[in-house]
Structure formats: C-alpha cells, structure tokens
Swiss-Prot record:
Protein name: Cathepsin E
Summary of subunit composition and partner proteins: Homodimer; disulfide-linked.
Leader peptide range in chain numbering: 1-19
GO annotation, biological process: antigen processing and presentation of exogenous peptide antigen via MHC class II; proteolysis
Catalysis performed (reactions): Similar to cathepsin D, but slightly broader specificity
Glycosylation sites: N90
Species in which this protein is naturally found: Homo sapiens
Disulfide bonds: C109-C114, C272-C276, C314-C351
A cellular component term, taken from the record's GO annotations: intracellular membrane-bounded organelle
C-alpha cells in the first residue's frame, strides 16, 4: 500500500511538471568580458567606464527608474530568440528573472549600440500600436530610454497578443555595442516593471498559453555552445536534474527573492549566520553579494586582484574550498571548478573568480544574487502559482 501511494505521488508530480512544455533553446556564446580579454581591451574597458571591479559597488533602488547594474551583463553567455510583430521580426534576448520589462532596439535609435543590433521597425508590422508612453531604465553608465509600443510577441510557438514592450531610442555606454544580445525579456514579478507594463509571462498566464503557471531554466556547463540549455514555459523537465526538487518560498514578490540560512566556506559558516536574503537571477552571470563580504570570500578562496578583477591560480583548484549556500535547510555546494571561470589568454589558462561585489542598498537590499554560476549547478524552477522556487542538482 505504501509503495502504491508513493507511486501515485510520483505520477502526480510528473503530471504537474509536464503539462504542455514549451521549450526555448538557449545558445551559449563567449561573454563580452571574454571577448574584451582576448583582444587585450578589458583594462581599457574598466577605465572608460570608470569601473574598478575590485572595489565595485552600485546603489540599486526599486523605483520607476528601475536601476540596473549594467556590469551584470558583462559575463552573460546564454541567449534565446523571440519575434515581435506581423510578419515576425527576430531578436536575440537575455531571459532575465531579475527584471520584468521586455525591450529591444528601435529603428529610430541612433546610439552606437543600436547600429550593431537588430532594430524593431513598427511600420513593418500590421499588428503594432503605440500607447504613447515613454520609459527609462537607469544603468550605471547612463539611461536606456525610449517609447512603449504594443504588438504580438512570439516565443517558440507561444504568441502573446497586445504585449507592451520598450523600444529603445538611446542606449548607454559601450557595453551594449559588443553584446551578443539585442534586448532583454524580463521574467520577474509585475511590481518590478517600469511604467506599469504587464510582463510577458503574466500575459502568457492571462491568455491561457501555458498549462501551469511556472517556467524553468537549465543552463548546460558544456562550453561548446551550451548544448541542451533551455528555458521551459509551463513546467519543468525531470531529465535535467537528479533527485527531487526542493521548494523554497518567495519572500518578496518583486525579484525571485528567497531566504538564505547561511553561507559556508570550507564547511565553516562565514556569512549570513543569522540568515539573509538572496535572489535567483538568470540575468546575472556571477554570484554577487555585499562588497565587504565578497572581499572576505575572495580572500578565503585565494583569489587576488589581477587586471581589475579577481583571479585564482588554475593549478590550485584542487585545494581550494567548497562554498555552500544553505537554503531552506538544504545545502547547495559549489566546488572550486563550479565557481571558477576558465578562459584562455594567448594560449594560457586564466581562471577568474565567479564571485563579484555588488551593494544593493535598502529598501531593496542588501541582497546576494545567485546568478548563472549557481544556476548551472542547480536546475531552477520558478513557480508563480505557488510563489516559490524549486532547486535540484542539475544533470551535466
């Protein structure tokens, strides 16, 4: 009888997970930082943006100006494709759980970054309309601004009608010029959306395009294009993780924010001994935390400043400590190979730390951000129906 009951529970969970799954392939490209480093331009980039990544801090606030740390996108490697309009115009985007707006470059944008990317042409779409509202997103090096348009947005067979989105007319700095992506599709809660725009996933749910009010993310560790990486709308795929999902309640419905019990380095609690807050963020490449804490963490793993960032000796990976995030009573351990980014410069190995200081001040912070370095190791499910995040060890 007990065996039958367990089987029924497993079947129920499988049914909940599957529904009708809509899979969005995520392609992995070399990050902007890797490209700049390969061209020996990384130091010049830091200087031109007045950035010292060793001391980097940035004040973030959750007001209508929606401050975003631009530096988060430097290491982004996973991108997908969407289309806007009739007939469809294709764009490469970051699917970002740390923001809630969709924006792409406008054909009317004259910033250098727009000239190197796909631009939306409203006059070419028969389903386009313009509400007439402006928008602005503040980044560390300036503001991205433009107008809000409305059109149908398609993502791998899911077509949202009447989706409002930003058409950028100005884009800040040099960062977006060399970026692999055209725009960003935010998957955060509506409270984060600039201009009161309804996010894409909320419209998917409202228009009954997904069977289940959840989506999931698998980021392959395969450096050759990240084969198999995908975003799933409407459920999750058991083949992408081992064991069972551990569900963690969302503590604040803006980012996908959860509570951390503690953070251990080498088996010893070093941070958050009385708990702290974190967000699971597909739009941040590294793991970030308060700058003073991250400095201690870099010292603990043996990372040292090199050319404006923290690096470790590649030969020391086998003796460096594990870093463990305890969440809802469950330990999530990152080995040194998991939290270290490997690159090649002039044929030589270069290993940089996957941790970055970022100060997010009240009322939004302080926050730790569990970005792609974490998500590559732990399959992540974002459940809007129950306001929770599911985590389990990812299958390589």
């Amino acid at each position: 009888m007990k065996t039958l009951l367990l089987l029924l529970l497993v079947l129920l969970e499988l049914g909940e997970a599957q529904g009708s799954l809509h899979r969005v392939p995520l392609r992995r490209h070399p990050s902007l930082k890797k490209k700049l480093r390969a061209r020996s331009q990384l130091s010049e980039f830091w200087k031109s943006h007045n950035l010292d990544m060793i001391q980097f801090t940035e004040s973030c606030s959750m007001d209508q100006s929606a401050k975003e740390p631009l530096i988060n996108y430097l290491d982004m490697e996973y991108f997908g494709t969407i289309s806007i309009g009739s007939p469809p115009q294709n764009f490469t985007v970051i699917f970002d759980t740390g923001s809630s707006n969709l924006w792409v470059p406008s054909v009317y944008c004259t910033s250098p970054a727009c000239k190197t990317h796909s631009r939306f042409q409203p006059s070419q779409s028969s389903t386009y309309s313009q509400p007439g509202q402006s928008f602005s997103i503040q980044y560390g090096t300036g503001s991205l601004s433009g107008i809000i348009g409305a059109d149908q947005v398609s993502v791998e067979g899911l077509t949202v009608v009447g989706q409002q989105f930003g058409e950028s007319v100005t884009e800040p700095g040099q960062t977006f010029v060399d970026a692999e992506f055209d725009g960003i599709l935010g998957l955060g809660y509506p409270s984060l959306a600039v201009g009161g725009v309804t996010p894409v996933f909320d419209n998917m749910m409202a228009q009954n395009l997904v069977d289940l009010p959840m989506f999931s993310v698998y980021m392959s560790s395969n450096p050759e294009g990240g084969a198999g990486s995908e975003l799933i709308f409407g459920g999750y795929d058991h083949s992408h993780f081992s064991g069972s999902l551990n569900w963690v309640p969302v503590t604040k419905q803006a980012y996908w924010q959860i509570a951390l019990d503690n953070i251990q380095v080498g088996g010893t609690v070093m941070f958050c001994s009385e708990g702290c807050q974190a967000i699971v963020d597909t739009g941040t490449s590294l793991i970030t935390g308060p700058s003073d804490k991250i400095k201690q963490l870099q010292n603990a793993i043996g990372a040292a400043p090199v050319d404006g960032e923290y690096a470790v000796e590649c030969a020391n990976l086998n003796v460096m400590p594990d870093v463990t995030f305890t969440i809802n009573g469950v330990p999530y351990t990152l080995s040194p190979t998991a939290y270290t980014l490997l690159d090649f410069v002039d044929g030589m190995q270069f290993c940089s730390s996957g941790f970055q200081g970022l100060d997010i001040h009240p009322p939004a912070g302080p926050l730790w951000i569990l970005g792609d370095v974490f998500i590559r190791q732990f399959y992540s499910v974002f459940d809007r129906g129950n306001n929770r995040v599911g985590l389990a060890p990812a299958v390589p």
